[in-house]
Amino acid sequence: MAAAFAPPPPLARLPAVLERLAGPLAGRLSSGRELAALQGVAVHDVPRAAPWSVALPGLARLLPGGLPRGELVELTAGRSSGRFACALMLLAAATSAGENAALIDLGDALDPQSAAPAGIAWPRLLWARPRAVREALAATEAALTGGLSLVVLDLGLPPLPGGRGAEAMWLRLARSARQHDTLLVVASPYRVAGPAASTVLELTRGRALWSGTGSAPRLLEGADGRLTLTKGHRLLAPQAQALRLALPA
């Protein structure tokens, strides 16, 4: 009889990571539990049974086995296309399933109060708010050594470095993800990781979805979109899946 799954304790293996990050990210590094306490957000840590790596709408049809652990996955989308919302869905699914995760938030986009409906298990989240791309990459490299199941690097909307030096940097992060069996998701406005990314997902936003008819007030409920798998193992041609991104209730 197989042993019951015992989720790792929240952020139990992070002391060394926190020590490495405390200097360069002083005042901009928080555990989710601290964050929730400051914002008055309810803390929950109840595992869910659903596989967390297929949390994005439509992802299960594109990647039936889920996002690959130990690899670098790119999620690209322009401004206001739902990229950060998708990142929150992944973080919520992973932490609610009993996994530990980190968000390297270069755009400083996380608002704990508005993100609460996403269902993130805050005690299992490490949140870093670097101010520059160099800091964000260093924080990502450190987080990959922390025994986490998921690291999300959201690059916001800054100009991003390119060239051979950048390619070597992404390859190094991909190697670290593989070595530590961590899923590294790089969310950016456009492709940055080049050949280091084993899987590439592109998110495009369609029309806005409104509630209300006739003379009733119209309320924005979300947006239609399309998730396209443009690179993946044994992928012969891009595959797309329609999705709907709902605003938190």
Indicate residue ranges for each PLM-predicted region:
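Amphipathic alpha-helical transducer elements in NTP-driven molecular machines
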Residues: 56, 69, 84, 130-137, ...
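Fold-independent oxyanion-binding glycine-rich loops
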Residues: 78, 106, 155, 188-189
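Phosphate-binding/switch region of NTP-binding enzymes
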Residues: 174-249
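Conserved catalytic network of the ASCE P-loop NTPase/AAA+ motor domain
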Residues: 65-67, 93-96, 118-120, 142-146, ...
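Detector for small/aliphatic-rich hydrophobic stretches
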Residues: 1-103, 248-249
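Conserved P-loop NTPase nucleotide-binding/switch module
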Residues: 152-183, 190
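Hydrophobic/aromatic beta-strand patches that form the interior of the parallel beta-sheet core
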Residues: 73-75, 102-104, 126-128, 185, ...
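Conserved inter-motif catalytic segment of the P-loop NTP-binding fold
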Residues: 89, 97-164
